[in-house]
């Protein structure tokens, strides 16, 4: 794949981790003075007319321009007059010159915009009453502000056949104004060259040329950047208007990135999920699973407590009966006879409440579904299990070594950051593991974990690349640590990171060692002292097992004694609920105010957008009620009190949107030398190799019909490619 030539000079791009469009920093003496409607403003050389206008608060209309995409300059809506210039200019593409006087509201500027708008509306169907973009449409807003009140066009309008690009994005291409935002997003951000234009002039069309699915994990973002109703959401079609919905700022838990989102609800139902700006995490994008899996929140839900009767069937019961049965078991068994497993969607408040409850019965067998090696530094040092460089820090790196991970599907927004740096900053990327399509070129070093030993010893050619780097990153996927030689892999990567710091040009506070997690609850669980993996439970099977949202299938009925009493607390009837003796229905992430910690160690909060269905309750409240019935009441009654307890155990869990600086890398490396384990010859294979593996990874996405349609569409598309029809 060739790198796309982005015209940085026209938009003044810099290599900044905070955003894609930045003006190049220069000394104050190099600033040039321009005037916007007579108002003086000092700007850097290379600043565009549009950026200069925005600096003084003057909004210029635009359709094709987007601050995170390259400049196209083809909609002509941003035309402005430059004093003494013979013609109006495109503000988005024209760099300013010293002394220019930009006239944004002159008669010539107004007439130019009216003319452009008249041509755009000449072929637009004007079907706003049935368009899902109505109420948040740039064409509506700008035609009202900058257009004329009548049209001179009396001929027949152009019509275009709609394209089928998959089960997520609905196309009504007659509405398309050829701004090419979607094409540039696909090529530059998503790294998938599926979209383009065919024809020219009045016959120009945007599409995939041949009918095919838009194969990207970020495809839904073209809905947001489309300025008209040409690209809309298929699952959301004809369901609500934006002014009818209530918007709640929250975060996503479909992966460990912690993307910021807006949950739109109406009448107690989640209608759609949109991205929310956070420059340090997801910028303005979200993954398709984040955006479209919300329909799984209303399917296969646990709405009432259930108990297993004498016939072995689960039947509905009251909260009092269910909690009394569980309380009786907790009173009957103590210590190692009681254990708990936390799943991937559990919040920090529930984790600390469950920890306190089990401590009341003298048990510390608290495990997570995801394995993380405890040998060496293990989870004792926080820097040993975090993405220490941070997500935004990727843009400062000059070399990235990926080990046993496929970030494109395990953490799509992190992968988008890598691609962004590769595209704009000439980042060099290498991979140890199965060859996968990461949307950017990389050096494939092989799939054997023993390559790590060669790099650490300096005998591998890539060792020299790392040595010469000024800001290298080694990113180890948590999926690689699920292997039997996970401790040896972690020790080898830690050794590489330490040797890089000692022998290369790394200076200052730059961190080399990074762990990329896949599930939202893992970092908070490790912060609270949970033991990674369920090996301790397999070795010493308990009499009472508490499954807190554990739907990963890490343990089955066959792994436990026949008389083991299993309690499942969660929000979906997925993998864990069918094996339980008692089911306690909990709340999903859109139904509670809760704390989650992402892979870089940043604590963030979800907010209540809708109420839990039926009799379901927030997880920490269920555990608090259970403790009272069992006669071991936990010392908190409100959410604030629970968070005070969180602060006592791990203060960083309540420092929201803050990252605690990681350290103790040298100590972690010294402890890693104590690991007495050999690397296996088995290849490093991440669990999510293709996009089909991306869509259904947890209880919510597995319950989503939309995600099931995506898997079906990808499967059928792959079969069509493998078995072409013979004419």
Swiss-Prot record:
Cofactor(s) required, per the database record: [2Fe-2S] cluster; [4Fe-4S] cluster
Keywords: 2Fe-2S, 4Fe-4S, Acetylation, Electron transport, Iron, Iron-sulfur, Membrane, Metal-binding, Mitochondrion, Mitochondrion inner membrane, NAD, Oxidoreductase, Respiratory chain, Transit peptide, Translocase, Transport, Ubiquinone
Keyword Oxidoreductase: yes
Keyword Secreted: no
Reaction(s) this enzyme catalyzes, per UniProt: a ubiquinone + NADH + 5 H(+)(in) = a ubiquinol + NAD(+) + 4 H(+)(out)
GO molecular function: 2 iron, 2 sulfur cluster binding; 4 iron, 4 sulfur cluster binding; metal ion binding; NADH dehydrogenase (ubiquinone) activity
Residues in 4Fe-4S His(Cys)3-ligated-type domain copies: 108-147
GO biological process, one term: mitochondrial respiratory chain complex I assembly
Binding site for [4Fe-4S] cluster 1: 124, 128, 131, 137
Similarity annotation: Belongs to the complex I 75 kDa subunit family.
NCBIfam families, sorted: NuoG (TIGR01973)
Name of protein: NADH-ubiquinone oxidoreductase 75 kDa subunit, mitochondrial
Originating organism: Gorilla gorilla gorilla (Western lowland gorilla)
Source species taxonomy: Eukaryota, Metazoa, Chordata, Craniata, Vertebrata
Annotated gene: NDUFS1
